Amino acid sequence: MKKKKLYTIYKITNLLNEMIYIGQHVTENLNDSYMGSSKYLKRDIIDFGLQNFKKEILFIFETKEEMIAKEKELVNKEFTKRIDTYNRSLGGGGLYTLGQVSVKD
């Protein structure tokens, strides 16, 4: 039996400097090890150690569209300009689906 996809919005907090990252993630396991896509966040996880970061699931949605809409609402222009966030891009991106691709010989 196939597991149900969970469309989530999460927050990762750096426990040392209180910087945060808000992102979206599609998973079948809320306890997976995914820790965001920000290169700035990834750099700090390497520098400070994973033990100094906390991940919280803020919202779980039934659809991708609901998840994307919530991330757009939370990670807006004002949010990305804050000095306490790793987010540098507006929310709502990141999940792009390509159509069918054919390769001819």
Q: Whereabouts are the PLM-identified features?
A:
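Structure-specific nucleic-acid interaction/processing domains
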Residues: 1-104
